[in-house]
Amino acid sequence: MQLSLSDVLNISLQNMDVVRILTGVSATTTGRTVYDTAITNAGIDVARGAFDPSFNVNNSWLENRTPGAVPDPIDPTQTQILGTRNDRHALILGLSKRMVTGGVIDFGVIGSNNRFPDLITPLNPQIGSSAAVQLTQPLLQGAGTRVNQAPIVIARIDTERSYFQFKDAVQSHVQSVIQGYWQLVLARTELWAREQQVEQLEFALRRAEDRVEIGDARLGDLSQARVAYENFRAILLAAQANILQRESALRNVLGLNPYDNDRIIPTSPLIDEKVEILWEQLLSLAETNRPDIVELKLILEADQQRQLIRNNDALPRLDAVALYRWNGLEGTMPNGNPIRADGFDDWSLGVNFSVPIGLRASRALLRQQELLIQRDRVNLEQGLHQASHDLAISVRNLELFYSQYRRYQEVRKAAQENLDQQSEIGNELESFIVLLQAVVDWGNAVANEAQALVLYNAELAVLERETGTILETHGITFVEERFGSIGPLGRLAVPVAYPAATPATGLIERYPSTDQPSEQQLNLRDPLQRYEDNEDNAEDLPSPGPNVESDDPSRTSSRNSAVIRGKGVSHQRSSSSGILETLKNWLR
C-alpha cells in the first residue's frame, strides 16, 4: 500500500494509546499513556479534600442496671442486693470545617434523655442539651492562606508536569515515525543499488564463462568473477532483510501488525532544499517550548511551594481558641409537671502553645528544601545549556548532511562515468578488478547519496524536536476526553465528568504524496541502459559469417560483443550459448 508520511503520522496518532518510540529496528514503549495526565489530575481533588467539611453523628441507646449492696433495715445482720435502672438515649452531632487560613471551626450538638424507672429524682425523665461553636486559629505554625493552599498548588503543578512529560514522549514518537519512514526509503534505495550491482556482476560472470569455454580467458578470471558475484548476492540478501526489518520497525511504532497482505511503499518526496537557520530564534523557541525545560521550571515552582510548608513547619505551635456554648435542661418534676430552663450560656478564650525544644527535625527539613531549590536552579541552567548544545549539534548535522548530499551527487556522477568507461567491452581483455571496483563505487555512491538525503530529512525532524515545536509544526494538538464517575454528592447523584484521557489528535497534511515511490526522486535509472539500447540496435544488423571480410576485426568483435545486461540469467537478451556461437563463427 502506498502511504505518504502524512498518512503514516495520522495512523500513528490513531493507535497511540501507548506512546512508542523507535529503537534501531524495533520499537519500545516510553511508559507513557494517554491516561497519565488524568491519573495525576486526581491529586488536585485529593489536596482540596483537606478543606472539605467533616460531619459525624453518634446516636446510642443505653439501659443500665447497676447492682448495689445495702443493709437489711429489718435485720441488720443481713444485706440486701438491690439495683437501679437507668435508661438513656444520647445524641452527639458534630460538623468541622478547615479554613484556608489554617483555622478549624467546629459546631457540635449534644442531647441526652435519662429515665430512672425505679427512682424518685428531681427530674424524671431528665433531658439535657447543649450546642457549641469553637474556633481554633493557628497564629504561627499552620497559619496563612499560601501555606495551606500550597498542597493544592503542588498537585496542579504535578498535573502540568505529567502533561509535559506526555507531550515530550509524543514528540519523540513523532520524530521516530518520521525517522522510520525515511529509513525505509533508504533501505529501498540501497536494495535497488544492490540489485543493480548483482545484475552487472552476473553478466560479468556469464561473460567469463563464455571466454573460458572458447579458451579466451583463464579459469582464474572465472573464479574471480564467481567470488565477486556470490559476495554481492550475500550483500543483496542483507539488503533484502534490511528492508523487511525497517518496515517491521515502522509497523511496530505505528501500532500495526507485523505482517499483513500489504507492503508499505513510501510516496512522500524527500526535501532536497537547504533550510535557512536563525540561531537566536531557535534558542528562544527551545527555552519556551521544550517540554523538558518547562518541566524543570515546574519542578522549581513545586519545590518553592514545599519550602513554604517547610518554613511554616519550623515555627512553634501557637493557637488561639474561642468557644461559645448554649446549655439547656428540661424534664418532669415528681408532681408530674414539666419544667424547662435555658439561657445558661458559657464561653471561653484561650491560647495554646507548644514547641519541640530545638525544632531539630523541622529545621533540618527546611534546610534540605533550601538546598533542593538550589539544585533545581542549577539543573534548569544545565537544561538550558544542554538544549543550546543539542541545537548546535542539530544545526551542524543539517549543514553536514546537506553538504554530503551535494558532494555525493558529484560522486555519483563520477562513479557513473567511471562505470560507463569500464563497461566498454571490446576485443581486448579488461581488468576484472577495475570493473569490479567501478561497480562497487557506483553502488556505494547511490547508497551514500540516498543516506545523506535521508539523514538530512530526519535531522530536520530532530531540529523541530530539539526546539519543542514538532507537534505544532505538524498540526498535532491534545484533546481532553472525559468520563462519568462518582462525585462529592455520592453514588445516588448524577455522575460527575472527570478527565479520562488526553490523546493527540490532528489531521496532518504537511507531507505531499506522489504516484511513485519516494526513492524514485533519486533518479534510480538503469546505469547501463544505453548499452542495452546499443544491443537492441546491434540485433538488427547481420552477424558476420565465415565468408565476411572485415578490415578491422577488433571493430567487428566490439560490435558483436556488445554489453548484454538483463535482470537475471533467464532475462538476458541473448543466452550464453548464442554469444559463444557468434564468437566461434567470427574466429573461423
Name each model feature, range by range.
Residues 55-63, 107-113, 320-326:
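Transmembrane beta-barrel strands of outer-membrane/channel proteins
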Residues 39, 88-90, 128-130, 179, ...:
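Transmembrane beta-barrel architecture of outer-membrane proteins
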Residues 107, 127-235, 239-255:
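Hydrophobic, small-residue-rich alpha-helical packing segments that form membrane-like cores
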Residues 1-19, 23:
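Regulatory alphaC helix of protein kinase catalytic domains
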Residues 63-65, 250, 257-261, 265-279, ...:
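Acidic, low-complexity, intrinsically disordered peripheral segments
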Residues 83-87, 125-127, 276, 341-345, ...:
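Short sequence motifs at beta-strands and strand-loop junctions characteristic
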Residues 29, 34-47, 169-194, 203, ...:
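Amphipathic alpha-helical coiled-coil segments
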Residues 16-34, 38-54, 82, 92-122, ...:
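A glycine-/polar-enriched beta->alpha junction
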